[in-house]
Amino acid sequence: MKLAQLFSNFEEELIRQGEEAESLSFVYRSLKNLSFTDFIFALQQEVTTEEEKQFVEDIYQQLAAHKPAQYIIGQADFYGMHLKVDERVLIPRPETEELVELILTENLETNLSVLDIGTGSGAIALALAKNRPDWSVTAADISQEALDLARENAKNQNLQIFLKKSDCFTEISEKYDIIVSNPPYISREDESEVGLNVLYSEPHLALFADEDGLAIYRRIAEDATDYLKDSGKIYLEIGYKQGQCVPELFRKHLPEKRVRTLKDQFGQNRMVVVDDGQD
């Protein structure tokens, strides 16, 4: 049997399991470190060993059990970086890259201080530190396991960020030019909308929040003035249903600030910005 036929068989099964067939080739290529051209060539070769067949089947079994491809290969790409990821942290999403791009585009000043609340793998903090090496970036998370992984990623990227174990602002004592957060924002009532590979594998602490998904936003809104410099800004990622309720929270608690809601590349409400600009 050629490798292409073996792949076809397992891909059909993955589709029946509700998973993306393309994940099989993505994981295989990543683990084998094959270019696309080399992979196409490999597909035409006969599977001559039980070891090779078992290798493909092992990948299939993990995907069929709804394990995300990024966890299988132990890596996710984010803003030009290869970040280590596993079940300790949420897998960085493309939408969050848009949040990073927005921050970099709107803030060209040097020597700014940034606080990333709920840093997880460190994706946002590291992307900002990489592209603004003169900025001072603090990455906070309630999970020590997440901070341990963020520290690994910082070391692997040869970047300096300050890591702090903190439940929102509980262990924060400074004021910052920029506060950014991609907090857990999915309501428990919306659990049925979450894909099985996310629901079964990614940390629920980083996915779900009380108060219809608004709990962390409320805490940030209520306390931000104590940790934000006078001309400081807040950048948030939000769920697509939260384009009205999250801005309302920040207008209530920071009435002197402008609050904007921006859409992502898919046309969904995805970012909220709190700043001193004029509407």
Curated annotation (Swiss-Prot):
Chain segments annotated as coiled-coil in the UniProt record: none
Catalytic activity: L-glutaminyl-[peptide chain release factor] + S-adenosyl-L-methionine = N(5)-methyl-L-glutaminyl-[peptide chain release factor] + S-adenosyl-L-homocysteine + H(+)
Protein EC: 2.1.1.297
Residues engaged in binding S-adenosyl-L-methionine: G118, T119, G120, S121, G122, D141, N182
Binding site for substrate: N182, P183, P184, Y185
GO molecular function, one term: protein-glutamine N-methyltransferase activity
Domain of life: Bacteria
Alphabetical GO biological process terms: methylation; translational termination
Keywords: Methyltransferase, S-adenosyl-L-methionine, Transferase
Any Pfam family hit: PrmC_N
Top enzyme category: transferase
Matching HAMAP family: RF_methyltr_PrmC (MF_02126)
PANTHER family named among the record's database cross-references: HEMK METHYLTRANSFERASE (PTHR18895), MTRF1L RELEASE FACTOR GLUTAMINE METHYLTRANSFERASE (PTHR18895:SF74)
Family membership noted in the UniProt record: Belongs to the protein N5-glutamine methyltransferase family. PrmC subfamily.
UniProt function note: Methylates the class 1 translation termination release factors RF1/PrfA and RF2/PrfB on the glutamine residue of the universally conserved GGQ motif.
Official protein name in the record: Release factor glutamine methyltransferase
The gene coding this protein: prmC
